[in-house]
């Protein structure tokens, strides 16, 4: 008998049972909330819950529009938030919606261009409004998900005074578990993962001091979710 077995025998005797060489099977979980919570909601119910939580708890402004009205809605929001200067993500989906061209024409918006390097960061720092396209929304937390890429710099939604997140209603997921499933499927399919995945829940805020919530401490003071009704 080696020292390890002798030691374990002593512990087992003290516990009043024989030495176990195989771990006991884990008890069946009481629930599977991590994967199933909020999945029973319809797309409309998810959107309603997302808007309610984001606006009431995360203090984000939520606006719904249709694809045809998206450029006008984005322009109106930029005007409310200070209009100029505006920096827009180089995301082709914003261009396809007509948002990029409209803001360039009406607000002299600058489009993030990886060729310009650090100049992009300076422009984002000086901008009143940053406009980005969100990959997903998360019902449970009222947050939006951003995938970084050379044409979609993180600074666009971090440095300007206000941020506008363009989000499709059909892309609102129940919670982060479903986002993990999407990422896993992409990885299994051999797709290249984004260099940075950000989950942003409303404007920057903190409640570290005496549990008093203060907004705009270390990032945008205002966050607007422009939700396109596509389902």
Annotate each language-model stretch with its function.
Residues 1-231:
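The feature marks the mature, well-folded catalytic cores of soluble enzymes
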């Amino acid at each position: 008998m080696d020292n390890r077995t002798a030691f374990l025998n002593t512990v087992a005797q003290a516990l009043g049972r024989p030495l176990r060489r195989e771990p006991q099977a884990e008890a069946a979980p009481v629930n599977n909330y991590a994967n199933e919570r909020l999945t029973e909601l319809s797309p409309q119910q998810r959107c309603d819950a997302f808007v309610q939580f984001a606006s009431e708890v995360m203090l984000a402004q939520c606006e719904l529009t249709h694809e045809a009205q998206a450029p006008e809605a984005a322009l109106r929001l930029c005007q409310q938030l200070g209009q100029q200067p505006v920096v827009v993500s180089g995301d082709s989906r914003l261009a396809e919606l007509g948002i990029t061209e409209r803001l360039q024409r009406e607000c002299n918006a600058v489009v993030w261009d990886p060729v310009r390097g650090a100049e992009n960061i300076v422009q984002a720092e000086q901008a009143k409004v940053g406009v980005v396209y969100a990959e997903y929304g998360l019902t449970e937390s009222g947050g939006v998900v951003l995938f970084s890429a050379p044409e979609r710099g993180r600074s666009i939604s971090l440095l300007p005074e206000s941020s506008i997140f363009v989000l499709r209603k059909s892309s609102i997921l129940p919670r982060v578990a479903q986002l993990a499933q999407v990422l896993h499927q992409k990885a299994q399919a051999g797709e290249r993962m984004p260099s940075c995945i950000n989950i942003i829940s409303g404007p920057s805020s903190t409640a570290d001091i005496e549990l008093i919530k203060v907004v705009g401490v270390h990032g945008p003071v205002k966050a607007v979710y422009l939700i396109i009704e596509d389902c």
